[in-house]
């Protein structure tokens, strides 16, 4: 840059600083780049698929999927992990369906959890914004976007048409709270439902509710699906779950993770550690027997997972080894942010 341009830039920066305050414009090379802080999802495979070890703080995250696919369970697992780190969490229950007993079984400290059951969509989003601006909340879950009913729709007749009302509400709210979320370093998770588009001939007919604004404002979008049942004999005790990272602004997207959700217990983390340990060479498998550091830990996956549950120190060491190996390479954030947009509802078969 020649001297005249340098002087012009310095004058412009000085004027901006006087008018808008110090730090309104910064040169990125003047500051050390810090890793994006993350909160674990409670699933080791999903943390690895997300690229930074969990969901990013100071960002908006959308989790969507069919009914009974594990959306609320996953968010409650995130809250449980955040509370273990001393975080303060809030749950905006627009569906009025939160079960405190079930949340407690998943490890959530329900006594410390802030819960709101708003009457209208405007009230829910205003409460969310006020909690964010308090700078005292670390995680907020909104369950769900489909239940954020505009006040005009609630006060109107059952057959009244309110075209685009919810989409406009979401667009306005997200414009308002995005900056506050970044300043407060708060993770805000929106749970969303799936609807079918009429008359789609090619491509997926699936779409999410609440318009397109959330798709743009979300830094991470997760598509969660139930792929099968977990059985003990003839009894179904859980569900096989697949989560695809269909959008990721903080790491490369389109990775996926598969894990089990056990009814009344949540994500089967110890089972995941056994599978990932075998896959990456930390756990030896010989026939039905599993061994770790040369010592047998159990016959069959269930017994080996029980051994990890009974020996939390060994489980923590194994988890750290897996995380250190699979999360050492720093993601190319700039490349991820500048990647060309794609159809986020497409099926992407890329295993971790």
UniProtKB/Swiss-Prot annotation:
InterPro entries documented for this protein: AAA+_ATPase, DNA_recomb/repair_RecA, DNA_recomb/repair_RecA_CS, P-loop_NTPase, RecA-like_C, RecA-like_N, RecA_ATP-bd, RecA_C_sf
Cellular localisation: Cytoplasm
Single annotated GO MF: ATP-dependent DNA damage sensor activity
PROSITE patterns, per database record: RECA_1, RECA_2, RECA_3
Annotated positions binding ATP: 65-72
SMART domains: AAA (SM00382)
GO CC terms of this entry: cytosol
Keywords linked to the UniProt accession: ATP-binding, Cytoplasm, DNA damage, DNA recombination, DNA repair, DNA-binding, Nucleotide-binding, SOS response
Gene Ontology annotations of biological process type: DNA recombination; DNA repair; SOS response
Highest taxon of the lineage: Bacteria
Stored HAMAP family: RecA
Family recorded in the similarity comment: Belongs to the RecA family.
Protein's job: Can catalyze the hydrolysis of ATP in the presence of single-stranded DNA, the ATP-dependent uptake of single-stranded DNA by duplex DNA, and the ATP-dependent hybridization of homologous single-stranded DNAs. It interacts with LexA causing its activation and leading to its autocatalytic cleavage. Plays a functional role in the DNA rearrangement associated with the phenotypic switching from a pathogenic smooth to a nonpathogenic rough form in this bacterium.
Name recorded for this polypeptide: Protein RecA
Gene from which the chain derives: recA
């Amino acid at each position: 840059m020649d001297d005249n341009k340098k002087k012009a830039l310095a004058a412009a920066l000085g004027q901006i600083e006087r008018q808008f305050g110090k730090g309104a414009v910064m040169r990125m090379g003047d500051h050390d780049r810090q890793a994006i802080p993350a909160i674990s999802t409670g699933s080791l495979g999903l943390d690895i698929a997300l690229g930074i070890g969990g969901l990013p703080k100071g960002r908006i995250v959308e989790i969507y999927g069919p009914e009974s696919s594990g959306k609320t369970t996953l968010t409650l697992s995130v809250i449980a992990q955040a509370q273990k780190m001393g975080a303060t969490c809030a749950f905006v229950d627009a569906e009025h369906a939160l079960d405190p007993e079930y949340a407690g079984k998943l490890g959530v400290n329900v006594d410390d959890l802030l819960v709101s059951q708003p009457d209208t969509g405007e009230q829910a989003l205003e409460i969310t914004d006020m909690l964010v601006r308090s700078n005292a909340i670390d995680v907020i879950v909104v369950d769900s976007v489909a239940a954020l009913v505009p006040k005009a729709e609630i006060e109107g007749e059952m057959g009244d048409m309110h075209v685009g009302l919810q989409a406009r509400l979401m667009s306005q709210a997200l414009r308002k709270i995005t900056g506050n979320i970044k300043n407060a370093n708060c993770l805000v998770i929106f749970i969303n439902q799936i609807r079918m588009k009429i008359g789609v001939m090619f491509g997926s007919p699936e779409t999410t509710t609440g318009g397109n604004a959330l798709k743009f404002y979300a830094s991470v979008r997760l598509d969660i699906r139930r792929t099968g049942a977990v059985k003990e004999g003839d009894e179904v005790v859980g569900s096989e779950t697949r989560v695809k990272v269909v959008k990721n602004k903080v790491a490369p997207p389109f990775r996926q993770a598969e894990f089990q959700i056990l009814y009344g217990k949540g994500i089967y983390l110890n089972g995941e550690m056994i599978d990932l340990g075998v896959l990456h060479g930390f756990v030896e498998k010989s026939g039905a027997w599993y061994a770790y550091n040369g010592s047998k830990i159990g016959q069959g996956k269930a017994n080996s997972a029980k051994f990890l549950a009974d020996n939390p120190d060994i489980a923590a060491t194994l988890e750290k080894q897996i995380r250190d190996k699979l999360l050492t390479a720093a993601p190319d954030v700039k490349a991820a942010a500048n990647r060309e947009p794609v159809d986020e509802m497409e099926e992407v078969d890329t295993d971790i």
